[in-house]
């Protein structure tokens, strides 16, 4: 579930429903959100057999769009339903099996129904053994060409000139807000535990600020994170929508619910829709930031009223998200390269010192600052058979010796590291009073010889998002 206000706080907002809501949230984490069996009604959907190009499934709201019932369309050939069907069929055959991104086939005209002869945008992708076609109101292509594309081109130039990731984020939220008109646009990244921190924000004055706030990992279940990696953009135009079921409910070719992972119109969990309403958010859009194949963060857009996002705008925003992802990946790779170069410099210096003195201990003791900088540590210990040399800020010698014994009992493990000594070394409770994390490397296969680096505890104040006025059940 995309971030907003902390979901746990929402549960606490109503004591009468807290138990049922807790169960709802637990169920939400298990919900197969890729197969909702329905779509959002800002468009309608048809599923075609890949080979025969006949209709296998259709959304019930086709009656609202075309004044035709689903059973009037099932089994019909593409060419029966759409003008220039042969041309469209050729375009559909060119869809890649590997690229599941919805592709704008063109603006099409239906041969019958209430929209007969009117242009309707058709977006399609190949997945789950079928062709999934989505139809929506056409966008103004001229406006997109004259406005959106120059904006994107200029934005890409600005990204390339950014000095760091924070500047990239600030530029991106401003640009996405300018392109989409959403009331609030923010970017947050995920830490190692999956919690999110808002780095940048651009908002209208009547929207509350989330800048600097953190959100718990539980707000986005694992299956939702996987979908954010697979499908880079997600739009909910109106949280009060009534979902339109598919007819028939299951894909006739597989006998299973249709996988809508990549569909723009894919319906949303009812729990999440209530979650949005409790945040006074009616429309939302999420753009994935994927770095090295992992979900690094999200560009999250909110609006207090229903808001349409046309295909051209979605395409521009997805491109912005992909460019931002590449730029962040490049910044991270550059920082990693610089760090490795610095490490190699430290290693050369330490090896030279050890060679000059013909001793590991004496060589490292001769370069205490370099030895500590190698691991960005505040203290270190050099352990040999007869010596325990301490550098910088370290635990007392007796606790270091106890740590060495504990390490020695871990047979066959040459490397140990932790960022939480109290959690990971409960056998030595006194140790956590002096250090928060450590790195230990065995340098002998026969003896208890170690290089150990220590880091102090780093206290961090986390500002979690406040709770809304209404509970999920309200």
Where does each model-flagged region fall?
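Non-catalytic regulatory/interaction regions at protein termini and inter-domain linkers
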Residues: 2-154, 158, 163-167, 171-179, ...
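Amphipathic alpha-helical "output/dimerization" segments
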Residues: 151, 309-329, 467-469
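A generic structural motif
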Residues: 303-309
């Amino acid at each position: 579930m995309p971030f907003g206000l902390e979901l746990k706080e929402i549960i606490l907002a109503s004591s009468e429903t807290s138990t049922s809501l807790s169960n709802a949230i637990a169920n939400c984490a298990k919900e197969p959100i890729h197969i909702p069996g329905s779509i959002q009604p800002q468009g309608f959907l048809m599923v075609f057999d890949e080979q025969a190009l006949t209709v296998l499934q259709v959304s019930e709201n086709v009656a609202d769009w075309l004044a035709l019932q689903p059973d009037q369309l099932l089994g019909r050939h593409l060419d029966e339903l759409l003008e220039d069907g042969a041309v469209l069929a050729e375009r559909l055959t060119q869809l890649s099996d590997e690229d599941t991104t919805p592709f704008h086939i063109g603006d099409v005209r239906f041969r019958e129904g209430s929209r007969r002869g009117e242009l309707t945008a058709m977006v399609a992708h190949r997945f789950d053994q079928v062709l999934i076609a989505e139809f929506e109101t056409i966008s103004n292509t001229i406006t997109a060409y004259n406005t959106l594309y120059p904006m994107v081109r200029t934005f890409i130039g600005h990204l390339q000139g950014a000095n760091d990731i924070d500047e990239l984020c600030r530029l991106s939220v401003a640009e996405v807000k300018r392109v989409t008109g959403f009331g609030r646009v923010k970017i947050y990244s995920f830490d190692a535990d999956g919690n999110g921190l808002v780095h940048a924000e651009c908002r209208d004055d009547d929207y509350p600020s989330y800048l600097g706030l953190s959100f718990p990992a539980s707000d986005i279940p694992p299956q939702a994170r996987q979908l954010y990696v697979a499908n880079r953009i997600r739009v909910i135009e109106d949280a009060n929508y009534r979902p339109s079921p598919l007819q028939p409910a299951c894909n006739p070719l597989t006998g299973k619910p249709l996988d809508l992972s990549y569909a723009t119109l894919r319906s949303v969990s009812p729990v999440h829709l209530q979650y949005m309403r409790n945040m006074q958010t009616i429309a939302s859009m999420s753009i994935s930031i994927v770095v090295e194949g992992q979900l690094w963060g999200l560009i999250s857009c909110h609006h207090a009223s229903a808001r349409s996002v046309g295909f051209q705008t979605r395409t521009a925003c997805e491109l912005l998200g992909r460019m931002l992802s590449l730029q962040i990946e490049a910044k991270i790779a550059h920082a990693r390269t610089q760090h490795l170069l610095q490490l190699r410099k430290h290693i050369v210096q330490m090896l030279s010192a050890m060679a000059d003195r013909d001793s590991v201990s004496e060589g490292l003791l001769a370069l205490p600052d370099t030895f500590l900088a190698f691991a960005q540590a505040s203290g270190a210990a050099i352990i040999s058979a007869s010596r325990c040399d301490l550098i910088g800020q370290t635990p007392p010698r007796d606790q270091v010796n106890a740590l060495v014994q504990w390490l020695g009992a871990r047979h066959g493990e040459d490397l140990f590291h932790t960022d939480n000594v109290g959690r990971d070394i409960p056998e030595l409770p006194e140790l956590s009073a002096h250090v928060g994390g450590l790195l230990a490397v065995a340098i002998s296969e026969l003896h208890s010889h170690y290089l150990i680096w220590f880091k102090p505890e780093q206290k961090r104040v986390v500002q979690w998002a406040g709770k809304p006025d209404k509970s999920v059940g309200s």
